[in-house]
Amino acid sequence: MANKNRRRYKKGKTFKKILREKLGVMIIIILLAFGGLCVRLVYITRDNQESYQKKILTQQRYDSTTLPFKRGNITDRNGTILAVSEKVYNVVLDCKVMLDDERSKEPTLSALAECFGLSRSDLDAYVENNPNSQYYVLKKRLTYDEISPFLDKEKEVAAEAAEFNKTADSDNQKGVINGVWFEEEYTRRYPNNSLACDVIGFTGTDNNGTYGLEEYYNDELNGTNGREYGYLNDDATLERTTIAAVDGHSLVSTIDANIQAIAEKYILQFNEEYRDAAREGAGSYNTGCIIMNPNNGEILAMASYPSYDLNNPKDLSAYYTEEEIKEMQDNNTYYDTLNQLWRNFCISDTYEPGSTAKTITIATGLETGKITGNETYQCAGGLQVADHYIRCNVRSGHGTLDVSGALEQSCNVALMEMGEAIGVKTMIKYENIFNLGLKTNIDLAGEARTASLVYNESTMGESELATSSFGQGFNVTMIEMAAAFSSIVNGGYYYEPHVVSKITNSTGDTVRNIEPRVLKQTISETTSAQMRQYLYAAVAEGTGKSARPAGYAIGGKTGTAEKVPRDHKHYVVSFIGC
């Protein structure tokens, strides 16, 4: 019996020993496996860390909001706002957020319908069909005054719900307005509507400028959008990063809004007065006016007819009937008509300067010594030049005239004789000196190139020299003539025309001053002084009498050029003076 018990004890002891050994082996295997997994995890983390981080981040809830920049202002020289960007709001509904609490649906949709005039049935249908929508724009570009009733309603509903829920049981709690937010952006506004429209230009929906200062200085006026990033971690912690927007720079222009308004007033008055003079039912095809400081190149006013409303640049109703506009849209000429309206006539269109160019011919003759000012000329009403008999503006002739009298009476014959004395080579040289045929580089978009519209030595023959001497046969822009004439009367200094005097940042600090630039000297002080005397006489005693304002002594020159084809009897009439 004792032996039997000893055998049982021995067997039990052996079993336990074997069990411990096996358990030890299993633990070792598990530890080795765990160690291997740890090593593998280290390698995975090291080699694929960025990839796994991205996967984790994509599972988190994000929001990203664009923070719009504010486009810079444009002011006149005295601080009058000509163009400004104003904050507006888009009404956005986030259905998913609203439906997070079913109790929010009713007050939210009711408030939207009430405050913004939206159809409640349309709202219900959209939410029903798009419960996960997070960005549904209900209204665009509303002012703060237009969204204020909703903001007030939101507070009112929240207050009522808070008061009611104090005593209501959990199953009967009232909901609040939720899931509506206001997306901020800026819209461009022009407080003076059509004032200085050719100078200012306008912006499109992409915030980029079209024509004028808006286009030329587009990069200065535009800033950089900011962005606000946010996401919720698994523990509902909100992480948020904000990159602030950088607002655009503002422009201080050389324009004087008061002078600009006066110029536009009288341009419109002229076209109303002579509405049926050339063609029934309309004024001139174009009328332009530049008021420029000859002593520094600053543009004080630049206006033209027809004009347009900068706040509604596609509106043609002032000039065309609904039927005419519809016809344009049907035959694809609508945008051609708009572009013609938007063009700045003073810098983009060319014309024959006519007798205003006689000032350049006489100044060239005096400066080069080809004429002295003591000459006399006999005008019998015309002059034979090569194979052409070229008439004077007075068919019976002016008789005997000196240089001053030739300018006063605008005698073509006398100017043709001066042109002959000057010669082709010198005439071409001085047209270049006065920058005719070259861009002035005024800081406005759309300046025309006229190099192909003036003569050169190979294209100017005897007849071309004769007609050029009194301003026909070649084309220039108004700004070319204004800059050239300014140098004739200011002592001979050719200033680059400019419309902006200063660029400032969003805090009003000066970023850059735009100083007057003298590019060259066209004539001497002596020649300039003599030309001022001639121009004064042309207004006091000559063809420019009607341009003389009461109480002021001015000098200037009239101009009349026949448009091509000459036999149609259409004319460009002009006056240039100071």
Model regions: which residues?
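Periplasmic/cell-envelope proteins involved in peptidoglycan metabolism and beta-lactam response
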Residues: 1-322, 425-433, 547, 556
